[in-house]
Amino acid sequence: MKKLLSLVLTLALALSLCVPAMAASESMTNFQKTATYNNQFSDVSASYWATPSIKLCYEYGFMKGTTPKQFSPTGALTVAEAIVMADRLHEIYTTGQSTLTNGEPWYQTYVDYAIENGIVQAGDFTSYTAKATRGQMAYLFSRALPASVLPSINNVQTLPDVTSSTKYSQEIFSLYNAGVLTGSDVFGTFKPNDNIIRAEAAAILTRVALPEQRKTVVLMKQVQWGAAKLAIPQSAGAGVTENGMYTVTSEQDACGVIATSVTDSAYKGLSVTVLTEQQMNNILTQAFNSTDGKLSNAKSTKVSFGSVKAYRTVGILTTDEGAGDCLIFTYITGNKMDMICLLAYENDTALK
């Protein structure tokens, strides 16, 4: 009997040691596919921008349809539903599974879990049934996982509609720099007070949970060039040279833009393509050689931008920064001839 009791105690001790060891630990590898998406959502077309994210969300168990055959991609989310998604991310990351069930009211279990695990604080939201905003979603999702698994891959320092005084600004910038948020335009406009839709939530969810889905971004800033507004990288510098050329340079990307415009009534009614390709080559070569740059190996071809006829010229431009491949577009509108030169010092794939 004593030997049997000893065996039972030894077995119990072994099991008590083995079970915790076999339990899932905090890890991004805990996110695993649990279902197969077979195009069952009739309101999600193959060409819809968020279809890949919706598919991944379904397969990884992050989101379900509003019905077995409907996802409602443009439907709004409530704060409670957004908390459910944040809880699901946290629980799977922490334990390897999602086990939470509805309470009374239905969302109370999820709110309690979020508070207990530091995803939200009591009093963060005045209504859990209100529609969730994009800013609130950023707040929840940035806190669902440890900051260590959301490292910065971008360097976003400014946004058009988010400042240090904007609610949730810290979480918003954190997700931009982690490659989770990209904005609604080239400037990174976020619209923090707009209601978030289910398709947008799917995109954010997949990028938080699956690092390979995160995006590197180069956000632009707007600068004025005469009557025109140009979009240039945030890290780029801009200025006007003594001879009136507008220049944009980015040391980070080893590239630049040179733009100039010449006004002459003689241009009115003309197309730049009245010039031959060789004449265009000669004009550009002489123009650059009269500045601090030198253009060589110029080769021009005729192109069109809608109704505007233009020349596309490739060549090698040498400046005090060194020699680089360049791409030049020259065209006439009204009584102005405009020239825009794109320059890459290291990697000419930027010009493709």
Question: Can you say where each PLM-predicted feature lies in the sequence?
Answer:
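Feature responds to low-complexity, polar/acidic, surface-exposed segments characteristic
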Residues: L4-L5, L9, L15-W49, K64-G135, ...
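Phosphate/pyrophosphate-binding loop motifs in nucleotide- or prenyl diphosphate-using proteins
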Residues: G61, G179
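Short secondary-structure junctions
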Residues: G65, L77, S235-E242, F288-S304
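Short, hydrophobic/aromatic-rich segments at coil-to-beta transitions
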Residues: V218-Q222, N243-M245, G306-I316
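Secretory pathway targeting signatures of secreted, lumenal, and periplasmic proteins
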Residues: G226-Q278, D320-G322
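Short, solvent-exposed coil/turn segments at beta-strand boundaries
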Residues: A231-Q234, E251-A254, V308, Y331-M339
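Surface-exposed amphipathic alpha-helical segments
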Residues: S235-A238, K336-K352
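Signature of long, low-cysteine stretches enriched in small and polar/charged residues
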Residues: N282-T333
